[in-house]
From Swiss-Prot:
GO terms for biological process: selenocysteine biosynthetic process; seryl-tRNA aminoacylation. It catalyses: tRNA(Ser) + L-serine + ATP = L-seryl-tRNA(Ser) + AMP + diphosphate + H(+); tRNA(Sec) + L-serine + ATP = L-seryl-tRNA(Sec) + AMP + diphosphate + H(+). Belongs to the class-II aminoacyl-tRNA synthetase family. Type-1 seryl-tRNA synthetase subfamily. L-serine binds at T226, S227, E228, E280, S379. This is Serine--tRNA ligase.
Length: 411
């Protein structure tokens, strides 16, 4: 959640940045009106309170005590009424603020959508073939690794069953990713896949993205769309010791998304599924640590791809493509020869204090004052998409898949 004081004191500047992130101008106009009303009603409340303080002190020496008592009693009622007005405005402001995204960093390019993201660099050269490479779903069906028909039968569309060496390769990737991330200093944690509404709110999924979440009927429980949600909220409502920061964690989980806005996109294969697996990086830092930890996380995910021999590129997301909670995001896109293009396989984001304010995660700074932490998250990596990348990049003309050397010990 945004700092409402900063929003009020620097409204025009912040509003301009939020417009770049596609915040509705009517919402910004409503906020401006609420801030003006709140200022007016607070001023009136302060005047009533000042009257009460001044004349309460004079009551003992007043000549007409009964008259003054009556005035003070009447003024107290006005204070109660005015306090209710102020509280109602503050609650309305906070409710609107819950649905307003984070402010983009200064380094984030202004743009409308993914077409205006900025390529930062390419890592490794794409694979070359002396034959036309197949897409992963063709390979998966011919090798009996991917069973889409039975996945749909037991669930619905956008579900798949992994079988035989495909399932083994997926398991090997999970173990390798966890080991790789741990070697970079990230502590492995295992968390529930079902979390409560407060946890969903803390990282920004609720209330804005409620329609894309799977909820358990009659219970305050949601299936997670990423392990960023439970891992970040492990420290919700806590005040951390300065010397414990940064906290760097990695976690494997299944992820569940309705993909409400993805009709017609990636309908074949396992690129976009309602259930998929991911190994995540999550960090909690002091404000002055978050930029360097962001670079560590990005390097970890990129080096992991390189260790698998997968060509990829770094993209800085523009304001129009930036996620709700993120102040800055760099995507990693892996080369898929079957599709003849790069596809997203990781997003690394710095959320600054946006999630920490919602989840109430603080630390005691060097001056002994409680200060909001910064939170960061990133995929290292999306398991299914890494499986896709290996299948397409390591195929031969007979349709067989060769296993990267670093994974062989996991079979």
């Amino acid at each position: 959640m945004l700092d409402l004081k900063n929003l009020q004191n620097n409204f025009d500047e912040v509003a301009k940045k939020l417009k770049n992130k596609k915040v509705d101008e009517n919402i910004l106009k409503k906020l401006a009106e609420l801030f003006a009303s709140l200022k007016k009603e607070k001023t009136a409340l302060e005047e009533f309170q000042a009257f009460q303080n001044k004349f309460s002190k004079e009551l003992a020496t007043a000549e007409d005590k009964e008259s003054l008592k009556a005035k003070l009693s009447e003024n107290k009622s006005k204070i109660n009424e005015q306090s209710a007005k102020v509280n109602a405005l503050e609650n309305e402001l906070e409710e609107i603020a819950h649905a307003i995204p984070n402010i983009p960093d200064e380094c984030v390019p202004v743009g409308e959508d993914e077409d205006e993201n900025v390529e930062l660099k390419k890592v490794l050269n794409p694979s070359s073939f002396d034959f036309t490479p197949k897409e992963h779903f063709e390979l998966g069906e011919s090798l009996n690794w991917l069973d889409f028909v039975r996945g749909v039968k037991i669930s619905q569309s956008r579900f798949c069953v992994l079988k035989n060496e495909g399932a083994l390769l997926s398991r090997a990737l999970v173990n390798y990713m966890i080991d790789f991330n741990r070697s970079r200093g990230f502590e492995f944690v295992n968390v529930p896949f079902l979390v409560n509404g407060a946890t969903m709110f803390g990282t920004g999924q609720l209330p804005k993205f409620k329609e894309d979440m799977y909820k358990v009927d009659d219970e305050d429980l949601y299936l997670i769309s990423t392990s960023e949600i439970p891992v970040t909220n492990l420290y919700s409502g806590e005040i951390l010791a300065s010397e414990t920061l940064p906290i760097k964690m990695t976690c494997y989980s299944a992820c569940f998304r309705k993909e409400a806005g993805s009709a017609g996109r990636d309908t074949r294969g396992i690129i976009r599924q309602h259930q998929f697996e991911k190994v995540e990086l999550v960090s909690i830092t002091k404000p002055e640590q978050s930029d360097s930890v962001f670079n560590e996380m990005l390097e970890c995910a990129s080096d992991l791809l390189s260790s698998l021999g997968l060509a990829h590129r770094h993209l800085m997301l523009c304001t129009g493509d930036l996620g709700f909670s993120a102040a800055k995001t760099v995507d990693l896109e892996v080369w898929l020869p079957g599709q003849n293009k790069y596809r997203e396989i990781s997003s690394v984001s710095n959320c600054r204090d946006f999630q920490a304010r919602r989840a109430k995660i603080r630390y005691k700074n060097e001056q002994g004052k409680n200060e909001l932490v910064h939170t960061l998250n990133g995929s290292s990596l999306a398991v299914g998409r890494t499986l896709v990348a290996i299948m397409e990049n390591y195929q031969d003309k007979e349709g067989k898949i060769h296993i990267p050397d670093v994974l062989k010990k996991y079979f």
